[in-house]
Swiss-Prot record:
This is Small ribosomal subunit protein eS12. GO terms for biological process: maintenance of translational fidelity; positive regulation of canonical Wnt signaling pathway; ribosomal small subunit biogenesis. The keyword Transferase does not apply. GO terms for molecular function: structural constituent of ribosome. GO terms for cellular component: cytosolic large ribosomal subunit; cytosolic ribosome; cytosolic small ribosomal subunit; nucleolus; small-subunit processome; synapse.
Amino acid sequence: MAEEGIAAGGVMDVNTALQEVLKTALIHDGLARGIREAAKALDKRQAHLCVLASNCDEPMYVKLVEALLAEHQINLIKVDDNKKLGEWVGLCKIDREGKPRKVVGCSCVVVKDYGKESQAKDVIEEYFKCKK
């Protein structure tokens, strides 16, 4: 029992916590994937968190998203690869071995609903508190 608590309650880094939060939000239908859905969610102030890919090849996307985030004081996390982000938010097929294939790149994701309280959500919120 104690070992299980350490495994589950060990120190979680921000990337792992982000993956967990995105997965939970996806299950509870709380994600806006892609620039159009993300911009609509940000404009309606439904967003809790925004994730943007650093390798987004359209500078106007980045400008639009960052402007909306600044206007509504919404937190931003940048990830290095849009393919990785696409995989995290379910924009891929999973083969028999459980490996993702046909991954579609996703440059912007907005979390509208965390789904449920979790340690990962707390890690993300703590990360933003420390950042300010």
